[in-house]
Amino acid sequence: MRLLAFLSLLALVLQETGTASLPRKERKRREEQMPREGDSFEVLPLRNDVLNPDNYGEVIDLSNYEELTDYGDQLPEVKVTSLAPATSISPAKSTTAPGTPSSNPTMTRPTTAGLLLSSQPNHGLPTCLVCVCLGSSVYCDDIDLEDIPPLPRRTAYLYARFNRISRIRAEDFKGLTKLKRIDLSNNLISSIDNDAFRLLHALQDLILPENQLEALPVLPSGIEFLDVRLNRLQSSGIQPAAFRAMEKLQFLYLSDNLLDSIPGPLPLSLRSVHLQNNLIETMQRDVFCDPEEHKHTRRQLEDIRLDGNPINLSLFPSAYFCLPRLPIGRFT
């Protein structure tokens, strides 16, 4: 029953389609035969157009199918062409042996030629990737350095504190003509090449406390601040008149070492000298004052510390007459 109902519905659809495509005269004839308003369904001529298995071939004539489906020029022409062959993408040649799982692709490290300097420190990276470079300052604190890293030419301030640097070589600061401050506090420095600082004419502050130095190298004359506290400096490790030519030196900190005498003569520019906690037992008469210039006063030198030494300062009264204040230390 369902099949018969479906075939009947299909026949009606095809009949309607066929009627629309019939010639004008045939359509007019059929319209005249259709019942008008008010007609009774009882007089409706059934003819043989009703689809049934016996007249299926007569109702639908497929012999003129091309004529029935010809729309003339009403539809745009569609050009049918063959598809272009698909572009074949050859897989990249692999150097991995068959059956071997491929490893993750390796990333190419970007070039570092645009950094301040392309030199490589002992970490295998440019200095300004290991350290922090801000303008003319380089901060290399507490990164386990064992040597002075290559520095940008424009470096003026170097901070490499709390590392494991054991030696300063002559070439470590070569060509760094703008270097003003070097701070190597809390390292393991036991030796400095004699020419390591000599050509650094712009150097003002040299800060080397808490190392293992036993001697000082030749120092540039422009230094203003020298801090070598908490080392192993001996008097024999400081060259005679080492500070005389340093006409800009204002602060000299040599406390907590192994000095047995005051290194002198000291420059007139000096404002503060700390020598506490050494092994000093005596001093020269001219270490602070010129014994022949009794009218001269060293007004700038107001801070002298000799406490923590075995010396009895009361035994050398003529050594302080030019000072605005007496040194701090033992007078009994």
Swiss-Prot record:
The modification Sulfotyrosine is found at residues 65, 71, 139. Disulfide bonds join 289-322. Keywords: Disulfide bond, Extracellular matrix, Glycoprotein, Leucine-rich repeat, Repeat, Secreted, Signal, Sulfation. Pfam families: LRR_8 (PF13855). The record marks 20-21, 32-33, 87-88, 114-115 as: Cleavage. Residues 29-39 have a biased composition (Basic and acidic residues). GO terms for cellular component: extracellular matrix; extracellular region. LRR repeats lie at residues 154-175, 178-199, 202-223, 248-269, 270-290, 300-320. Gene3D superfamilies: Ribonuclease Inhibitor. Glycans are attached at residue 312. Residues 116-153 form the LRRNT domain. O-glycosylated. Proteolytically cleaved by MMP1, MMP2, MMP3, MMP7, MMP8, MMP9, ADAMTS4, and ADAMTS5. Proteolytically cleaved by MMP13. The degradation of OPTC by proteases may contribute to osteoarthritis pathophysiology. One of its GO terms (biological process) is negative regulation of angiogenesis. Residues 21-41, 86-106 are annotated as: Disordered. GO terms for molecular function: extracellular matrix structural constituent. It comes from the Eukaryota. Inhibits angiogenesis in the vitreous humor of the eye, and therefore represses neovascularization. Binds collagen fibrils. May be involved in collagen fiber organization via regulation of other members of the small leucine-rich repeat proteoglycan superfamily. Belongs to the small leucine-rich proteoglycan (SLRP) family. SLRP class III subfamily. This is Opticin. It comes from Homo sapiens (Human). The gene is OPTC.
